[in-house]
A protein has these predicted regions:
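Flexible, solvent-exposed loop segments that connect beta-strands
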Residues: 93-124, 154-167, 197-211, 244-259, ...
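Outer-membrane beta-barrel architecture
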Residues: 71-75, 131-135, 173-179, 217-223, ...
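Transmembrane beta-barrel strands of outer-membrane/channel proteins
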Residues: 61-65, 85-89, 146-150, 176, ...
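Outer-membrane beta-barrel "beta-signal"
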Residues: 358-369, 373, 388-401
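N-terminal, post-signal peptide beta-strand-biased segments of exported outer-membrane/organellar beta-barrel
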Residues: 22-98
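Residues that define the transmembrane beta-barrel architecture of outer-membrane proteins
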Residues: 66-70, 124-130, 166-172, 208-218, ...
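Detector for outer-membrane/organellar transmembrane beta-barrel domains
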Residues: 215-338
Length: 401
């Protein structure tokens, strides 16, 4: 049973790092493209902040399925420097902010505005205090950008006498990126650091529980011109995570530790045609993770690995008319997973995963509206035609000025 649950956990981690599947809480255009990494979008600026210059002087509102799900982005500046103010976007406080768009695979990680680091669930869920972006041009063919996000949430009690007690979680997101914008080669690089810290003194300072979860990600994307209207896109990412929980009881500390490493690489063509943009790429992925529930004891650790070989992603955006765009995307991945523990037990699983998304966009001069539709809308129709779901999973509206 333990091996089965560990194997399931390894699969979830792998899916977060490598599947790149879109969900109902992802922003609408990218969600309709099933989270394509090679068809460029304004959401690129969240993990590659230097690209903010490309989308300057824009306001975007993202609307989820309820009034408390959504986010906002305001970008303003000149052709030399741009600034961004972000409201209620959850990848600022997500442990997957260090991975290339992997927050798209976290339910609620985008438009719910807050998500706990997995190791720190017991400390509550932090909410964003500040989330800022900045980008500046370096010469004619380069740009540099930064992102800073801080989040916190908690409760505390301070009696007239005695020690204060409470529980809290704090997260810090620091991102930096560099792009080369030449005609022969376009290159986007980013380095992201996400730090989560939690503490719980509700049982007294002598019985404090504390934890940390640190994520580091290095991501790259390259576009090489092949021929007229065709580029070769190359993507890659390395993501490292480590942390643990320490529980104190009467001065005795018990500490646990977790470690995970993920690597992904892929390549494929991008077609920029007169009335369509098409991107397809194959990718390979590898991840490994280990857990030690008590670092002072032997023979209680476990580990797992997962290999994605191969994976393929396809997406398209078609201008049906001057004002109506259809979008669709899909992804298939075949994975080899294994899990073992120090007692000599092991388990393996080979499986495939598939998913698709669709939606549309409306363009009226400087105003755009994007909709990611429920999958069943395409096959069973809307409610008034006998279908079983609503219309849009998410919607976005933007105005350029």
């Amino acid at each position: 049973m333990r091996i089965t649950s560990r194997l399931l956990s390894a699969g979830i981690v792998t899916a977060m790092l490598f599947a790149f599947t879109a969900n109902a809480n992802a922003q609408s255009r990218r969600s309709s493209l099933h989270g394509s990494l090679v068809l460029e979008d304004v959401t690129d600026a969240y993990f590659m902040p230097q690209l903010l210059l490309k989308y300057r002087n824009l306001m975007q509102i993202d609307m989820g399925t309820s009034a408390d799900q959504g986010s906002g982005l305001l970008i303003f500046g000149t052709d030399q420097m741009a600034f961004g103010i972000v409201a209620h976007r959850g990848d600022n406080v997500s442990p997957s902010g260090a991975a290339m768009l992997s927050a798209e695979g976290l339910p609620g990680a985008i438009l719910n505005g807050a998500v706990s680091f997995p190791l720190l669930n017991q400390f509550g869920t932090p909410s964003t205090i500040v989330d800022l972006l900045m980008s500046m041009k370096l010469g004619d063919e380069a740009a540099l950008g930064f992102r800073l996000g801080i989040a916190n949430a908690g409760t505390s009690t301070s009696p007239d006498s005695g020690d204060s007690t409470g529980v809290s979680q704090t997260s810090l997101n620091i991102g930096a990126g560099y792009s080369m914008l030449g005609e022969a080669l376009r290159m986007d690089l980013s380095l992201n650091l996400n730090i989560g810290l939690g503490s719980d003194t509700t049982n007294g300072v002598d019985n404090e529980t504390s934890g940390n979860d640190i994520r580091i990600g290095l991501n790259g994307r390259f576009y090489l011109p092949m021929e007229d209207q065709v580029e070769l896109a190359i993507i890659g990412g390395i993501n490292l995570g480590f942390g643990g929980i320490t529980q104190s009881a009467g001065g005795n500390d018990v500490s646990s530790s977790n470690f995970d490493l993920g690597i992904i690489a892929g390549a494929g063509p991008v077609y920029k045609l007169g009335k369509a943009r098409i991107g397809a790429y194959g990718f390979l992925g590898f991840s490994t993770s280990s857990q030690d529930p008590n670092t002072d004891q032997d023979n209680d650790d476990s580990s797992g690995t997962s290999i994605t070989i191969p994976g393929v992603h396809m997406a398209m955006e078609v201008d049906v008319t001057d004002w109506f765009k259809f979008r669709g995307g899909l992804e298939y991945a075949w994975m080899i997973q294994s899990q073992s523990d120090s007692a000599g037990n092991s388990q393996g699983q080979n499986s495939g995963s598939f998913g698709w998304s669709g939606g549309f966009g409306l363009v009226f001069d400087k105003f755009t509206a994007d909709f990611a539709l429920h999958n069943s809308f395409f096959t069973t129709g809307p409610n008034f035609l006998g279908g079983g779901t609503g219309f849009a999973a998410s919607a976005s509206a933007a105005y350029s000025f």
